[in-house]
Regions:
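Basic, alpha-helical nucleic-acid-contacting "clamp/cap" segments
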Residues: 52, 85-87, 93-142, 149-162
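Short, basic (Lys/Arg/His-rich) helix/loop patches that form interaction surfaces
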Residues: 152-208, 212
């Protein structure tokens, strides 16, 4: 997947970033470390994170997170039967009026459904089996989907290997607020939905992509409670 093919380009790197509604801070980069705020993740950075995944399963997981802007729990529920020619069928966790959503893929991700089905065929997955399965089996001996924690770990470790980091909004094991920290899945969702709004000016499209019952404009600015 070439980042330049993505039909929805992210905000250019180096743009002023907004950590809150009152002030702006410039993106910081260095030879050893470079990091950006959530809205500053560029297609190059996203592609670097995806390429830093250590296996095909993890690369496909990161590609789906980026292409769909879906919640981690929604992506982990993906099965071979949910993969269609130009869209993916995902559960909609937060909208009781629409429990399933069709997420159409941008032109740059046109090969993603085929890649997912090849992965499923190579591993002999049944139509109802989770595509992103763990090495551990379920109580019935069947394949078990990766957990949310495992998915976050996969993306964070790939981000560290790619040396793509963001400014932390609160303290973590990676350091104090304002210190560089690895990217995480929620940032892919923020960046994708925000980028659709900015590049297309199509609020209904962003609303459908996110699976919202209404467009939450406040969601497009990351707050402290939405950081790690």
């Amino acid at each position: 997947m070439a980042a330049s093919q993505d039909s929805h380009a992210l905000v250019p790197a180096g743009r002023h970033l907004r950590l809150d509604s009152r002030r702006e801070v410039r993106t910081v980069r260095s030879a050893q470390k470079h990091w950006q705020p959530p809205e500053g993740l560029s297609p190059h950075d996203v592609q670097a994170v995806i390429e830093a995944a250590t296996c095909e399963r993890d690369r496909l997981l990161l590609r789906v997170l980026w292409a769909t802007g879906a919640r981690v729990s929604e992506v982990l529920a993906l099965r071979p039967m949910d993969v269609q020619r130009d869209h993916l069928v995902l559960p909609n966790r937060k909208n009781p009026n629409l429990t399933v959503k069709r997420v159409y893929l941008p032109a740059g991700q046109a090969d993603l459904p085929g890649a997912l089905l090849i992965w499923a065929n190579e591993h002999g997955l049944a139509p109802h089996t989770p595509l992103f399965f763990s090495r551990k089996h379920g109580p019935d001996g069947g394949l078990k989907a990766l957990s949310r924690v495992q998915a976050w770990t996969i993306l964070k470790e790939a981000s560290e290997r790619a040396d793509v980091r963001v400014l932390a909004l609160r303290a973590s094991r990676h350091g104090a607020p304002g210190e560089p920290a690895p990217a995480h899945p929620h940032l892919f969702r923020h960046a994708r939905v925000r980028q659709i709004v900015r590049s297309t000016r199509n609020s209904p499209l962003a609303q459908r992509q996110a699976g919202w019952s209404r467009l939450q404009m406040a969601y497009l600015t990351v707050g402290d409670d939405e950081a790690r």
